[in-house]
């Protein structure tokens, strides 16, 4: 059974994905997501923080992610890009959530929506990103 927080992360990634693909305004995307049947089981506050925070800071987040990529950013699968941007926001703006939790949640969301091995790629990038964004947080190993 998915937690309300997992559903919020999934819905935030879907919203970021829609913004990347459709170039629709964030308020319209959020309205459409809120009308989905799954939204009733989500943490609305977390969804709002993740989606709108990612939208506001996406350019900065892609600058942080770009040097860690093994390919051109334009070659990123849109789902992987949405997951990386959303997780980057959570790592940057939500220090109350331990980074291993953020990475694990991003992996699970990628397994749900992404390609076959997309979760491995996301894991590798987020491990490096977490070390840069949260250098003082205790290591999980």
UniProtKB/Swiss-Prot annotation:
Stored InterPro entries: NusB-like_sf, NusB_fam, NusB_RsmB_TIM44
Coiled-coil regions listed: none
Keyword Cell inner membrane: no
Keyword Transcription regulation: yes
GO function term, MF aspect, one: RNA binding
Keyword annotations: RNA-binding, Transcription, Transcription antitermination, Transcription regulation
Gene3D superfamilies named in the record: NusB-like
GO cellular component: cytosol
GO BP terms, alphabetized: DNA-templated transcription termination; transcription antitermination
Function, in words: Involved in transcription antitermination. Required for transcription of ribosomal RNA (rRNA) genes. Binds specifically to the boxA antiterminator sequence of the ribosomal RNA (rrn) operons.
Family: Belongs to the NusB family.
Full protein name: Transcription antitermination protein NusB
